[in-house]
């Protein structure tokens, strides 16, 4: 492994991302594909880049990311969380700025389970008076 590599694990919904930061030119590889190929949606790409843009390090690191589980937005959120943790491993003084933006906290919201007798988690069957 490289001598100056920084690692961060990120999670969101049912997605988990492993992020490896290496000094470089700003290349982002997700599951052996580029950011543009992996995320078709512009919003997902923006979410991934948010912590790097905040601390002005977009072109300072190359990133190698593996992400599993969940959907597009969950995976993007997990990657953002992992990048944030890796940046904090690189430089702990960035923590305050990243926390203020809300990237350090793991978003604990999960899908609510479906209950017996209901159609979804909270949606009740239609009530008929007669």
From Swiss-Prot:
> Entry's Gene3D superfamilies?
3.30.230.10
Q: Which portions of this protein are annotated as coiled-coil regions? A: none
Pfam families according to UniProt: Ribosomal_S9
Annotated TM spans = none
Q: Which GO terms describe its biological process?
A: translation
State a single Gene Ontology molecular function. Answer: RNA binding
The keyword Ribonucleoprotein is annotated on this UniProt entry: yes
Keywords associated with the record = Ribonucleoprotein, Ribosomal protein
* GO cellular component terms, semicolon-separated: cytosolic small ribosomal subunit
As for family, the record states: Belongs to the universal ribosomal protein uS9 family.
UniProt protein name: Small ribosomal subunit protein uS9
Q: Which organism is it from?
A: Yersinia enterocolitica serotype O:8 / biotype 1B (strain NCTC 13174 / 8081)
Per the record, the gene is rpsI
